[in-house]
Structure formats: structure tokens, C-alpha cells
């Protein structure tokens, strides 16, 4: 039995890492930590959204990618390695998981559409 990441998971993880390496070097992170350059933080957030991480756990029938939690973990590793000051676990992991398992179909349609 194989206990590593799949090729797709590694590909997704590498894309997030490459983006963050290019767009969020330590000097940029320091500027954000100092409370300056909110626009840089917003641009970083938009960049990871463009990579699709906001949709990884949303089911395909609701417009998401329908991936599993191991994809979320792989992405989390990349974000943590960069010390990226970005929202991730709450809005893109916990919220979709709670909605997926606790909402009825009408609620899923409504909430996932807004994500």
C-alpha cells in the first residue's frame, strides 16, 4: 500500500509553492507583518484563489473541484513553508467540510455558490 501523495496532489502542491516562492518572499511577508501594504496581501490572496485552492473541497456538482482532504493538507504544507499570511484553513477547508457534511441540498447550493 502506498502512503505518499499522488502525482496530482504533488502537482497542486508544487504550483502553490512556486507561486508563493515567486510572489511572497520573506521581505514581502515582513512588510505585511509590519502592517503595511494591505494591497500586497490582497494580491497574494487573489493569486491563491486563481490557483483554485478556494474550490478544492467543494463538490463538483456545486462548482468546485471535488478533491479530498489530502489535497488540502498538501496545500497547507506549501502555505506553512512560506509563512503565508493568508486565510486558508477556516474558509477553504473547515467551512466547505462543514457545509458538505452538515447542510441540506438547498443550503449547499446557496453557500457553495458564494464561495
What are these regions (language model features)?
Residues 14:
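Conserved "HGTGT" condensation-loop signature of ketosynthase/thiolase-family condensing enzymes
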Residues 24-115:
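Glycine-rich flavin
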Residues 1-8:
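Intrinsic disorder at enzyme termini
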Amino acid at each position: 500500500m502506498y502512503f505518499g501523495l499522488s502525482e496530482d496532489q504533488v502537482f497542486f502542491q508544487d504550483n502553490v509553492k512556486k507561486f508563493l516562492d515567486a510572489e511572497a518572499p520573506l521581505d514581502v511577508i515582513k512588510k505585511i507583518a509590519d502592517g503595511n501594504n494591505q494591497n500586497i496581501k490582497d494580491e497574494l490572496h487573489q493569486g491563491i484563489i486563481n490557483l483554485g485552492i478556494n474550490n478544492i473541497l467543494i463538490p463538483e456538482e456545486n462548482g468546485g473541484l471535488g478533491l479530498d482532504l489530502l489535497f488540502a493538507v498538501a496545500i497547507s504544507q506549501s502555505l506553512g513553508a512560506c509563512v503565508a499570511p493568508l486565510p486558508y484553513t477556516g474558509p477553504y477547508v473547515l467551512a466547505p467540510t462543514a457545509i458538505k457534511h452538515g447542510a441540506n441540498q438547498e443550503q449547499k447550493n446557496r453557500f457553495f455558490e458564494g464561495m
